Design a protein with these regions (language model features):
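Glycosyltransferase donor-sugar binding loop
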Residues: 6, 33-47, 66
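Short acidic/histidine- and often glycine-rich active-site loop of Leloir-type glycosyltransferases
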Residues: 98, 111-121, 125-126
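Nucleotide-activated donor-binding/catalytic signature segment of Leloir-type glycosyltransferases, i.e.
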Residues: 46-67, 71
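Conserved acidic donor-binding segment of nucleotide-sugar-dependent glycosyltransferases
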Residues: 120-121, 125-132, 141-147
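Short hydrophobic beta-strand element within catalytic cores of glycosyltransferases
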Residues: 99, 105-108
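Conserved donor-binding/catalytic core segment of Leloir-type glycosyltransferases
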Residues: 1-13, 19-22, 35
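Acidic donor-binding loop of glycosyltransferase active sites
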Residues: 75-91, 104
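A short, well-ordered alpha-helix in the C-terminal region of glycosyltransferases
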Residues: 134, 141, 148-163, 172-175
Length: 181
């Protein structure tokens, strides 16, 4: 199974939490691969590389730590079985919306802005933010249940194609303006 961490790599995105979780996940799921795709903030991947090295995770990590041009984004999503967003702090997530629009299931931290979009075990999977044990447990649970993974994937794709469809957004915006008069 391929796990995808996608986007700008900053401390608030929680890649360190995911890497610490990965060391426990590979014990039960040695065939898992974490694809890290995105440019490191200020070109500094040092802390993450140290975690990978100290925990012997290099065989389980595929690093594409560079800017990903728009025309290459689809390749990364096509390779992924699950997209992981272990954010520590966030106000909104374009990556979550993009993940669901590509028809991929997402595992996200339980921050309020993310919980406004998805529901645990229905349209995505949630874990306790900044908790690598919670993340590892949820990853192992997901990897053991491919049927649930597929159902959540379908539900997430349906959510994005209905609630976040441009026509629906336009209808809701029009309705909001009309309610002012």
């Amino acid at each position: 199974k391929v796990l995808l961490f996608f986007g700008m790599i900053k401390k608030v995105k929680g890649l360190d939490v995911l890497l610490h979780a990965l060391k426990d996940v590979v014990k039960e799921n040695p065939d898992v691969l974490l694809l890290i795709a995105g440019k490191a903030w200020e070109n500094d991947f040092t802390n993450y590389q140290r975690i990978i090295d100290e925990n012997n995770l290099s065989d389980y990590c595929l690093l594409h730590t560079k800017f990903i041009p728009h025309d290459e984004v689809e390749h990364y999503y096509c390779a992924a079985d699950l997209v992981v967003l272990p954010y520590k702090k966030i106000y909104q997530s374009g990556v979550l919306v993009m993940t669901l629009s590509y028809g991929k299931p997402a595992l996200v931290s339980n921050l309020p802005p993310l919980k406004e979009i998805v529901t645990d075990m229905q349209t995505a999977f949630l874990f306790e933010s900044e908790n690598s044990i919670s993340l590892a447990e949820k990853l192992n649970l997901i990897l053991l249940d491919p049927e649930k993974l597929e159902q959540v994937r379908i539900n997430g794709e349906e959510l994005i194609n209905t609630e976040y469809d441009w026509n629906e957004i336009g209808r809701q915006t029009k309705q909001a303006y009309q309610s002012l008069y």
